[in-house]
């Protein structure tokens, strides 16, 4: 099959794997939390903090961005003309309130010095427009990002193999990864490549792509069944920058004391008791944001798929920024605040995030996102039912 740009493709027996993954997700949650009073998330279980911020969408130069895209992608003039950047969340200059959930990526709560991915789940509030049918809220847009460019899987079948091995036992997962070296490398990269000094100065990528607009004849029942083309496909990124113009990029820094050599006992290297909790990132967030002059910034950027070497359905392949740089369309800002309130922590645990919660024009695309659309509601409903809660949509006006 000759593949095309901006197009997601179905996989063989895809629908069968949806049902299998739902069963595995239920089993995973029962294994983790069946005999406990409260349930955490099945991944990104350890929350560091719930932080309030703002996402400003700039009055960016749409034509300049399209000219840049035209230089990097083999697009016809009609394809370029069909791309509209100023729609949905990006439609006009505006400042939105956001809630940010900072977390570790692991399925259980581990010390922060352990190798892991770090994430921010961004909930943008006050977003108007036609919703995705799978949305669980009416005026929010969720953007989930990690401090790595990749995801752990190439295909839905691969993800089922990985996830079912994870559910069965750590030993089964190790054996599966040994048999799938490319996935082993992806997991190692995702969890071990970065242990940032602060989550407030780390860079984050969405890992999986989203549409930027829909064609007039788009049928939401078709993805996963037949090839579906979009006007454009992008990934999101948040790049830490300094507070003063020209807002230079903040270089990556590692947590002090973390050994650069693999397989070294990190607790020992840091002089920490392995039997005691290590909440380094939560402590850093609390202390950094408690300072009266605290302010942190990230450029909000979009990265276009510009060639078939940047696949939509394969989450392991990196979209190289030298081939398609992130183009700035806004800025995320976090300023001084007190965040160590018990009620705020409870509020944070009860928030529900999904890439499928948002506007139709920002539809998540690709195999990994189609899986998430099936599995995320199962996990979220389990977690809320276990807590005896009915989901409530946040407004950004909450106080604690």
Cite the ranges covered by each PLM segment.
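Active-site-adjacent core segments of small-molecule enzymes
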Residues: 1-400
């Amino acid at each position: 099959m000759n593949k095309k740009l901006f197009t997601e493709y179905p996989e063989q027996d895809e629908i069968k794997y949806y049902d299998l993954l739902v069963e595995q997700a239920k089993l995973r949650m029962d294994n983790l939390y069946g005999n406990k009073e409260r349930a955490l998330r099945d991944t990104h279980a350890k929350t560091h903090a719930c932080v309030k911020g703002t996402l400003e969408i700039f009055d960016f130069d749409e034509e300049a961005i399209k000219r840049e895209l035209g230089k990097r992608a083999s697009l016809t003039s009609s394809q370029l003309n069909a791309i509209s950047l100023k729609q949905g969340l990006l439609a006009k200059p505006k400042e939105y309130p956001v809630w940010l959930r900072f977390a570790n990526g692991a399925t259980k709560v581990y010390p922060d010095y352990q190798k892991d991915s770090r994430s921010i789940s961004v909930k943008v509030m006050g977003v108007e427009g036609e919703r995705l049918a799978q949305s669980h809220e009416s005026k929010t847009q969720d953007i989930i990002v990690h401090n790595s460019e990749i995801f752990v899987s190439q295909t839905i079948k691969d993800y089922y193999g990985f996830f079912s091995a994870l559910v069965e036992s750590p030993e089964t997962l190790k054996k599966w990864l040994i048999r799938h070296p490319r996935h082993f490398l992806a997991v190692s990269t995702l969890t071990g490549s970065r242990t940032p000094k602060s989550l407030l100065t780390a860079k984050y990528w969405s890992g999986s792509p989203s549409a930027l607009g829909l064609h007039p004849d788009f049928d939401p029942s078709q993805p996963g069944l037949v090839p579906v083309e979009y006007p454009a496909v992008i990934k999101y990124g948040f790049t830490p920058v300094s507070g003063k113009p020209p807002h230079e990029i903040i270089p990556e820094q590692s947590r002090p004391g973390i050994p650069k050599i693999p397989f070294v006992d990190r607790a020992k290297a840091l002089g920490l008791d392995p039997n005691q909790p290590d909440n380094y990132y939560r402590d850093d967030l609390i202390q950094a944001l408690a300072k009266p002059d605290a302010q942190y910034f990230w450029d909000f950027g979009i990265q276009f798929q510009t060639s078939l070497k940047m696949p939509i359905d394969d989450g392991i392949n990196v979209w190289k920024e030298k081939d398609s740089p992130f183009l700035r369309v806004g800025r995320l800002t976090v300023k001084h605040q007190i965040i160590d309130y018990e009620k705020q922590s409870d509020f944070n645990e009860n928030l529900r995030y999904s890439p499928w919660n948002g506007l139709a024009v920002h539809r998540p695309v690709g195999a990994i996102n189609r899986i998430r659309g099936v599995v995320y509601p199962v996990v979220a409903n389990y977690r809320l039912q276990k807590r005896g809660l009915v989901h409530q949509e946040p407004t950004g006006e909450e106080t604690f």
